[in-house]
Amino acid sequence: AYHEIDSVSQLAAQYNIPNEYDKLMASIGSEGSNAYTSNDVTCYVENIPSNEIENWARIQANRFRNMIIRGFHTELEAVYEEKNISMGSDGTKEYAALWKLLTPTHPYGTQTTIGEQEHLKNPSIVNIKNYFHRYYVPNNVAIALAGDFDPDATIAVIDKYFGTWKAGKQLTRPEFPAQKAITMPRDTSVVGQDAENVMMGWRFKGANQLQNDTLDIVRRMLSNGKAGLLDINIDQQMKAMETGAFLDDLHDYSAQN
């Protein structure tokens, strides 16, 4: 029962420090502590002073080896609220419908990143921990650094704190059948409260293909906020409320929209 869950959550709260991680990172001068999940990656972001790289490495190495889950119940409520907001967004529903047409038998089209309400109703902490131990392993992680730092010294620090992290033996990568060729236009409608609009998309190969550089140039030629073909011929002449073009360069497939 939910009252039992709440009572246990209150007991757990006695061991919880609110915003513990943010406070820890702020103590070493970090700004912009954040994370996001997309179709292809889960990414954790920090903006740290270059003289705090060692403290950053010490914290992150411990964090990703020894996950401590606190505030699970309250965090779940936050995620559920995000789902509710997305369900009320015509743009979000339209975007999902477009990818369903482009990749009907691939997860890009069959599910959203946040999932369905049913997925959030009864989450399993056991499954979450199993997922962590399978995928949060060094042979499935990339560390990307940019800024004013000594590369050799920084690599030595990373080796010091991450070098003994054992590779995961259970790591698997999902494989999906190739999408069938699109031989004729596909269309659908999304009903909502927003003004009528049209979203069009063309499916291409994945982001690691050279073709994507060309697609990015085409996208900028169409729409760049000032002198794109759509900007000049439609927006500036007030033939539509708004136009735009963007490239979804995902790992398995890209879409020019």
What are these regions (language model features)?
Residues 58-62, 156-161:
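Short amphipathic alpha-helices in soluble, non-transmembrane regions
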Residues 62-69, 162-169:
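A common structural junction motif
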Residues 54-56, 73, 208-212:
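Solvent-exposed, non-transmembrane alpha-helical starts
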Residues 1-51, 85-140, 164-209, 220-257:
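Non-catalytic beta-strand/loop surface segments
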Residues 49-52, 147-152:
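Helix N-cap motif at beta-to-alpha junctions
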